[in-house]
A protein has these predicted regions:
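Amphipathic protein-protein interaction modules
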Residues: 47-98
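Eukaryotic acidic, Ser/Thr-rich intrinsically disordered low-complexity regions
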Residues: 91-119
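Helix-loop junctions that connect tandem helical modules in alpha-solenoid scaffolds
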Residues: 20-25, 63-64, 109-113
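HEAT-repeat alpha-solenoid elements in large eukaryotic scaffold proteins
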Residues: 30-39
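Long, low-complexity, highly charged intrinsically disordered regions
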Residues: 1-30
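Eukaryotic alpha-helical solenoid repeat scaffolds
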Residues: 3-9, 88-90, 118-119
Length: 119
């Protein structure tokens, strides 16, 4: 899967992202695409829209598993790196729920990043 195919997949689970993807500079590379999707996930976390949030987390995992190397790097560099920041203000119970619902592939990438950084 390349970043153009990822956009189509993202729009299926987060139709609100369509508007952002209409701005062409946001569709030019994998990093911009994952940045838009990460912002959509952050909005869902703030709205506490658990059903759509879980669908989006699963879609992010699918992009991570099936995406080309650039998409995988973008997911690790943007989404995984942002997880702590976007869940920082959540109540502990809600934060735990989010991390429980993150698919295994993304959980492993998150743990690799946390342990690699020496934290």
């Amino acid at each position: 899967m390349n970043h153009i195919e990822a956009i189509q997949e993202i729009i299926k689970v987060a139709p609100e992202a369509t508007q952002e993807f209409e701005e062409t500079y946001k569709t030019q590379n994998s990093f911009m695409v994952i940045n838009v999707f990460t912002k959509q996930i952050q909005k869902l976390i703030l709205k506490k829209d658990k059903k759509v949030l879980i669908q989006c987390l699963n879609k992010m995992n699918e992009i991570y598993r099936k995406g080309d190397q650039t998409l995988k790097n973008a997911v690790e560099s943007i989404f995984i790196y942002s997880l702590d920041r976007i869940t920082f203000n959540c109540e502990n119970a809600y934060k735990n729920l989010i991390f429980e619902k993150i698919p295994l592939g993304l959980q492993k990438a998150y743990l690799r990043q946390v342990y690699k950084s020496g934290l």
